[in-house]
Amino acid sequence: MASLIYRQLLANSYTVDLSDEIENIGYAKSKNVTINPGPFAQTGYAPVNWGPGEVNDSTTVEPVLDGPYQPTNFNPPVNYWMLLSPLNAGVVVEGTNSIDRWLATVLVEPNVTTTVRTYTLFGVQEQISVENNSTTKWKFINLIKTTPPGNFTLYSTLLSEPKLHGIMKHGGQLWVYNGETQTLLLQDYVTSNYDSLTMTSFCDFYIIPRNQESTCTEYINNGLPPIQNTRNVVSVSISSRNIIHNRAQVNEDIVISKTSLWKGVQYNRDIINRFRFANAIIKSGGLGYKWSEISFKPANYQYTYTRDGEEITAHTTCSVNGVNDFSFNGGSLPTDFVISRYEVIKENSYVYVDYWDDSQAFRNMVYVRSLAANLNDVLCTGGDYSFALPVGQWPVMTGGAVMLHAAGVTLSTQFTDFVSLNSLRFRFSLSVEEPYFSITRTRVTRLYGLPAVNPNNDRDYYEIAGRFSLISLVPSNDDYQTPIMNSVTVRQDLERQLGELREEFNALSQEIAISQLIDLALLPLDMFSMFSGIQSSIDAAKSMATNVMKKFKKSKLASSVSTLTNSLSDAASSVSRSSSIRSVSSSVSAWTDVSNQFTDISNSVNSISTQTSTISRRLRLKEIATQTEGINFDDISAAVLKTKIDKSTQIAANNIPDVITEASEKFIPNRAYRVISNDNVFEASTDGRFFAYKVGTFEEIPFDVQKLADLVTDSPVISAIIDFKTLKNLNDNYGITREQAFNLLRSDPRVLREFINQDNPIIKNRIEQLILQCRL
């Protein structure tokens, strides 16, 4: 059974103690060593309390709704809507280019018959005939004249219930809204010298960029957001838009805290990240028609660039992870074209670029926190590669492209021929792009991804612009550099890595095939087979197993087993001292630890629910102690864990102890267990639900806590893989025999596989729900 991995970890905890004891003996024998740490020995220990610090961001975010602004005369910017919000009827806005266009808009309230009103427009009183037949909507009337002494004529109108109107300069024309709310149209005025056209607003107004035109239209249709209609919103002068903001420099060092020999420094840097891929193309022996491998290799690249007038020397290392293996076999003859394996990076792959430069930020990168970075995307396209055959036309692998998207940053170390460099590792996720790649003169075509054959497309490098910010704890003495071998990634960055690993792990639940999962759950997984999916794990399997057991020994499951063992020992001695007393407390306390709760058994549902919930939490331990032939929750948990480890692209050997331990505690939190007595079944779940029912008819019977307590002590505990509600649903919809019912109650894997192979939706849905509960 797959749960053998948990049993093995529980049973071998003593090896961890022995390993620790051996290490302690080794330390004791080698402790008498004289070390001369030099004049800066105190800097080996960092202060506990770090300064608060901040991460500056130079990104300018343009608001969608800018305002409100007070009535004024100004030249509105091009490609920006001026959203007018008058409160009363009358003149709303005037505008002129002082050459051949004088424009004005007046507002008329609802229910106005045709009448002549006097308006002061451009300092002159004008008689304008207006009307508004609408009973609910206000009417904006747009007027125009071409000479100062001329008369205003009607150009367009807008009926608006929220009393909002918009004007914009764009494309050599003046644009306004026309028609009626919910069916709005845009109307343009052709005007010369429109850049210098000034507007005089007689009401509050807002400014909205043209790329948010749909939002402006929504406001005119439905009104401003509620927060804009409160008394706390006060209009300001348009001159406030011209305030000069002093922003932090993008390249600077800020001392944010200083204590004794240490200081916290925030480093902000703009960077130019250049990298290139490397590859290996290996031909097979023979007549020259076969290639054995085309693969990606790590590539170092050194370059210089200018940052704020300073020449920067930078070094990058590019590597890939999660490659996809492809092959092409043209036939079995010695002269048939064959590629045994060629690597392609796709959506499931990652590209790592380790970056270092000679600035102060990388000199003392030992204790680091608040690490953040922003980088642009970059498109990587593949080039052509001709496979030189001795005779005949040469096949050519051509095309392929991926887009690199920044997906995170951590600390790393680069190793060159001469030095080791503390660096930043930028991780990029991939998306496939056009064009696809193909091999000419073969049937390989329309495949997507970037093959390893010519990933740089004859470029010297790919380039990404970006910036990063970090806070580093450095010695106050600027002449001292902390040793590189002490480099550590602080907990914040470790938690970010584990968080990303958890997200990927949980997302893999959708990719697990149920039929294969049942088969895997029946295998006797041990530590070595569990780790087989981790690259280079065979070489470090022994040390990894020890690390896993060290971590697992502190888990809740191991602690519960230890507590249970002590409880059983105490219970046995208690029974021997007082064998005449038989109660719920004496028979079940070792397994349930609820003896105090059972002293006064209540008939209320709440009391029974509390008791059964407490019992069910310990039933997992009883099941581990008395293995049955059926499949259990830990088998499914271990099988899902193994599948996700094999599929994961982010998991590494140092993550295994945390993953194994967390999975044992958190996978399938909602479990139900049952015990069978003749034709009666008692079932209790960790969420407090409980059932008692007959096997043949699934008819519910009264639930007896005392009976359950007695049965738990003497009978095997079975995982309710198919719980009572699922069984009843299955029987009601499909009908099952008594034998099938017994097999499902015993979680018989053979019967489960039969139902799954028949695509039974009820059973498949139950197993899928269990898989979805396997989350970190």
Swiss-Prot record:
Residues covered by region (Hydrophobic): 389-409
Site, as annotated: Cleavage: R231, N232, R241, N242, R247, A248
One GO term (biological process): permeabilization of host organelle membrane involved in viral entry into host cell
Region (Spike foot): 510-776
Name of the protein in its database record: Outer capsid protein VP4
Region (Spike body and stalk (antigen domain)): 248-479
Sequence motif YGL motif, location on chain: 448-450
Keywords from the named record: Capsid protein, Coiled coil, Disulfide bond, Hemagglutinin, Host cell membrane, Host cytoplasm, Host cytoskeleton, Host endoplasmic reticulum, Host membrane, Host-virus interaction, Membrane, Outer capsid protein, Viral attachment to host cell, Viral penetration into host cytoplasm, Viral penetration via permeabilization of host membrane, Virion, Virus entry into host cell
Motif (KID motif): 644-646
Species name: Rotavirus A (strain RVA/Equine/United States/FI-14/1980/G3P4[12])
Other notes: This strain probably does not use sialic acid to attach to the host cell.
Residue pairs linked by disulfide bridges in the UniProt entry: C203-C216, C318-C380
Family note: Belongs to the rotavirus VP4 family.
Keyword Thylakoid attached: no
Coiled-coil features, chain-numbered ranges: 484-511
Motif (DGE motif): 308-310
CC annotations in GO: host cell endoplasmic reticulum-Golgi intermediate compartment; host cell plasma membrane; host cell rough endoplasmic reticulum; host cytoskeleton; membrane; viral outer capsid
Region Spike head, annotated ranges: 65-224
